[in-house]
């Protein structure tokens, strides 16, 4: 029973860390990366379809993304979807290939992005602490039902705290790497 609680807490904490990594991958740095456009949807025959399903996105070089649209008639719609996104990008089409040059980030914008990234990381830490709280309350319920002893409860809480510390450390490492990437010129 205790192992189930610990396993569940660990899985949920890992999912929180992965969700943070995924969220931070969408924050624009000075470098071109295909995941930058992963949040963009295109109107494809009346349905909002992710860009990655209607086109191939590759990083042509450090500052340019190249998008090859599978259906030529969608080129205009893809271009418009990129322009309408809040990424501040200006796509240029050349036949079926759309090139998206990434303008260099200003110092002020970098600092704003660092603040945003820190906020996301704090949200991840809060999620991990909430998972710890849930696991500890599950343990308290078992203790109240006399299904586990106080020693087992204390030992399990210590182990859950170790899981929490490890997850928070991972979040801090991800944050530090992203901040470093953002502040590179």
From Swiss-Prot:
Localization in the cell: Cytoplasm
* Top-level taxon in the UniProt lineage: Bacteria
One GO cellular component from the entry? cytosol
Q: Which GO terms describe its molecular function?
A: ribosomal large subunit binding
Q: List keywords of the entry alphabetically.
A: Cytoplasm, Protein biosynthesis
Q: Which residues form a coiled coil?
A: none
Q: Does the keyword Protein biosynthesis apply?
A: yes
Task: Give any single GO term for biological process.
Answer: cytoplasmic translational termination
Tell me, what does this protein do in biology? Responsible for the release of ribosomes from messenger RNA at the termination of protein biosynthesis. May increase the efficiency of translation by recycling ribosomes from one round of translation to another.
* Family recorded in the similarity comment: Belongs to the RRF family.
Cited PANTHER family: MITOCHONDRIAL RIBOSOME RECYCLING FACTOR PSEUDO 1, RIBOSOME RECYCLING FACTOR
Q: Which NCBIfam families match?
A: frr (TIGR00496)
Q: What is this protein identified as?
A: Ribosome-recycling factor
Question: What lineage does UniProt assign to this protein's organism?
Answer: Bacteria, Pseudomonadati, Pseudomonadota, Gammaproteobacteria, Vibrionales
Q: Which gene encodes it?
A: frr
